[in-house]
């Protein structure tokens, strides 16, 4: 059906999702959760890291980045107002807000959506943030382009600050050939660039969320997308409206500003419509591909968890991939609070951070918006299986090592 041969997350595999398995469940978050900032919503979050995925500290400071918006904006309207903010901390959990990372002139569109921030390899303090430059109009997202903005990080005994980040460079966007674009579907998804070096070939790549390039609703779901399901299983007709994929691009320039799109690594046609924030861990000869998704974005006839999903390859980044734990679910909301957390990001050290999304008050039934960081959970990767084993403080995101730089404080001007 498609002009490429990607691994498939099938309906049969997704049917195995077990919302009651404690080895793949977040701890329950109560209604009295702590709020990091009473003037800001924050959601998708990522650490300052090296290009190999390891969180790093800079001159004694841990640094994270989050999508932020003013709390006077309604919770469900925050996406069109998203900016990238940064926080710093000595202990990896007592976060101080430093402000917006990008200057007003940097983004040529209306919102800044997720990506990742790396220390430029071989540099002392050069930082590169890959993000989604997003344009909203009255109908929603009109443009979504992977972009990069660059600057430098500085620190002293009082905190962290940045300079630069006053312009950005567009890198790649949906082509309508491998990845669905606006013309094919005005509800398309294309975002969340994650840049890394593939240890197998030493090349630099970027993962991203996308949809399969097909006019929405025009293609039928095939046996390869359905998989081995029980006899008489009915696939609803509208299941073909869901066409999530995890895409990959190859870097063509040493400054990481020129890229070429490659066919997707994984598709979920007829299974789910969103596989957001893809990222990768290389461990014990295996390649672990992670993403996040919602129960609400599953195709008709399927149900799942809001949370972290994962797939494993024994043959490197290009697969083939099989879903972890048989279903793909790695860490979802508990059955009592299925929407409590989202935007899970697993780091090389096995720690998974996320944000508090929506808590259901057990007394009133009302939904309480979170907009703050959730408890961090350790997940152990054991071959084709995973196990949630330990719970840490809210927003605990420690560095794995210190970026190699002279420890002397920088001078403020």
From Swiss-Prot:
Gene behind the chain: sacC
Classification via SUPFAM superfamilies: Arabinanase/levansucrase/invertase
Source organism of this protein record: Zymomonas mobilis subsp. mobilis (strain ATCC 10988 / DSM 424 / LMG 404 / NCIMB 8938 / NRRL B-806 / ZM1)
Compartments it resides in: Secreted
The protein's name in its UniProt record: Extracellular sucrase
Keyword vocabulary terms for this entry: Glycosidase, Hydrolase, Secreted
Molecular function GO terms recorded: beta-fructofuranosidase activity; levansucrase activity
E.C. designation(s): 3.2.1.26
One GO term describing the cellular component: extracellular region
An annotated GO BP: carbohydrate utilization
Catalytic activity as recorded in UniProt: Hydrolysis of terminal non-reducing beta-D-fructofuranoside residues in beta-D-fructofuranosides
UniProt family annotation: Belongs to the glycosyl hydrolase 68 family.
Catalytic site positions: 44, 276
Disulfide bonds: none
Site (Transition state stabilizer): 192
InterPro entries hit by this protein: Glyco_hydro_68 (IPR003469), Glyco_hydro_beta-prop_sf (IPR023296)
